């Protein structure tokens, strides 16, 4: 083999080795023990430790609810025991009469979600779901962003039908008729799945407060058809 051909072969092998190395390096953050998947699991665990939120589809829309708990011995907020759907900076974000979000977990991350969603006009439920889903996916798969440590429930009647969606730190999206996220959510979700029936608003409010643990301070908002 001539020196020229030998050099060309060595160059090809060198480039092939570089590509394989690049592939391995790209995969490593996702699948190594200290990589991306454990970070997703940690973000979901952090979100599950938050005070619970609930979403219920009822006969005329979607009801979103959120519980407020004092932290570090602080007193309960001034809206004790009231329906506080007008609360600024709360756990329920109204994006108009037909679209709203509720967040559990890291409230700074939920606020960041709100900044992206606020002020945008969505022509349909699908458009709103696609936009918020893309935001979660971007934070989940990119290496230069932090995974969002929040579960978000979206209630929408933009198309005339009442629909409820959950967005998780992993980037997954699920549609439900009843869902709880935050502390004790697994137990409550099982009970809701067994007992759920299409509800009136009054009954939905009662079920929501029960799912939230009959809190002293809470927030409710109705997305009506």
Label for each model-derived stretch:
Residues 2-225:
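Long, low-complexity N-terminal extensions
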């Amino acid at each position: 083999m001539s020196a020229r051909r030998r050099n060309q072969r060595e160059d090809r092998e060198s480039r092939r080795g570089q590509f394989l190395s690049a592939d391995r390096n790209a995969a490593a953050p996702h699948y190594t023990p200290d990589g991306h998947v454990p970070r997703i699991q940690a973000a979901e665990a952090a979100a599950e430790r938050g005070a619970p939120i609930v979403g219920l589809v009822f006969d005329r829309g979607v009801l979103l609810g959120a519980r407020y708990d004092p932290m570090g011995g602080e007193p309960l907020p001034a809206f004790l025991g009231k329906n506080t759907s007008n609360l600024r900076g709360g756990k329920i974000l109204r994006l108009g009469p037909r679209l709203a979000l509720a967040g559990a977990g890291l409230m700074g991350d939920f606020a960041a979600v709100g900044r992206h969603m606020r002020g945008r006009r969505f022509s349909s439920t699908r458009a709103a779901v696609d936009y918020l889903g893309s935001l979660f996916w971007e934070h989940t798969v990119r290496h230069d962003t932090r995974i969002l440590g929040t579960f978000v429930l979206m209630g929408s009647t933009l198309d005339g039908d009442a629909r409820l969606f959950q967005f998780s730190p992993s980037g997954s999206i699920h549609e439900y008729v009843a869902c709880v996220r935050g502390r004790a959510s697994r137990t409550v979700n099982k009970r809701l799945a067994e007992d759920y029936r299409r509800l009136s608003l009054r009954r939905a409010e009662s079920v929501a407060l029960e799912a939230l643990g009959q809190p002293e301070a809470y927030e409710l908002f109705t997305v009506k058809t």
